[in-house]
Amino acid sequence: MKLNNAVLSQSLPGYALPQYDRQAMARRSRQQPTWLHFGAGNLFRAFPAVLAQRLLNAGETDTGVLCCEAYDTDAVTQFLRPYDDLTLSVSLLADGSMEKEVVGSIAQSLTLPQDRCRVEEIFRAPSLQMVSFTITEKGYAVNAAVKEDMGRAPGEAQTLLGALAACCLARFEACGAPLALVSMDNCSQNGEKLREGFFAMLDAWKAAGHVSPEAYAWAQEKLSFPWSMIDKITPRPHESVQKALAADGWEGMDIQVTGKNTYIAPFVNTEKPQYLVIEDDFPAGRPPLEKAGVLFTSRDTVNAVERMKVCTCLNPLHTALAIFGCLLGHTSIAGEMADPDLRDFVTTMAYEEGMPVVIDPGVIEPKAFLEEVLTQRFPNPFIPDTPQRIATDTSQKLPIRFGVDMGLHLERGTAGQLQRIALVLAGWLRYLKAVDDQGQPFTCSPDPLLEKVQPIAQAIPFGTQATQEDFGSLLEDASIWGVDLKAAGLSALVVEDFNRLNQGPGAVRTTLEQLRKG
């Protein structure tokens, strides 16, 4: 059994199928496009494309989504087009069962720069309402390639930001209709990051005489850049899912690694819980995505949801598990949640130190969100996520994931009660020694500050006691912790905790066990 249009007319027990005329949908979508998405990777195929299918199945819309890939074009040329732009989406439930769906909402798949003319044609269409993005935070950066595009004419742009700006200028010339450019990437204030990158390009072209005052004014007035918060764990395709699909009779489900080091397959595997909250700023209208569970609200509320998740209810727990998981030799987040000491640690940290200062966004109840994280999402053994992956770039994550809540506790005068948050910070210093709890060496995950901070921790011998002076000015560096730990009155506690964790083999386990038993 092959994944192509022919399979849609077959009976497939155990699979949800498109409930619409796919050929008619694709024809309408190409002629009168409403939604274009950049970034044809796993997250897009597991989430936005499935949202589009929900609307099509319910008869809430008659057009799907067109997608374009500008970074890793193999995602389109090898994993969409050969399969008639169909995808198998597999939700991995905590009880080991799978919910499987053939997703047919992708009406056309394109690549840049190869399909530049077609992409520009889509932008010229007055029917186009929104252009969305899952291109990672790095995709919005004004890097060397983008700067080269600033020196070219719009028609010669090579980067995604350059092509986007050029296509918007083409829209101005063709119809002048407004448009929403919607980042759906998992980073704070994502709409602002997209807007800054876009206008950096437009400003350079305006200075070079490539953009008229009228076109520039149109871009400022008629283009919107809504903020969003997206949350859905979508790990790389997993061999266990591949085997299950093969057992169902599917052919050609091989997992491959592209030249850009993307792990990809004709299927995607993901968790079932999902959240997408978007600032409701769509000057050209939008698909009725609220009918598929998307929350539309104000920018302030989007920001509040992001803070709830990133500063309290999910990301700090992930980082705590990453640090202690690496020290204790764990290789999966689910495995850590089966460890009584670690499960108790993150649960108590969340409820006793996070929830008292949590930002309540109003549209999502923090306690219910946290409960789902602790009881369904993290313990799911079929989501193959690792502490080693999450430990990447920890120095860049600590200020947001812990610094914000520490700052709120400081304002309330309760920072001295942060027993577990302080232990996480001490745990990271202990992690930097690259010696696990058995005294065996391991390799720290990549981190841009590793060369700066690791020598400080490694200068303190394993099994010895440190003083605050041994850490120099590190404990006062608010760019790492989010607050000056010394000024906050937490540096002594962090060093004391470090010494407990650094006593010798088994000290990390003993410390966590003692905390659990009180």
Predicted regions and their residues:
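Substrate/ligand-engaging "lid" and interaction regions
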Residues: 1-518
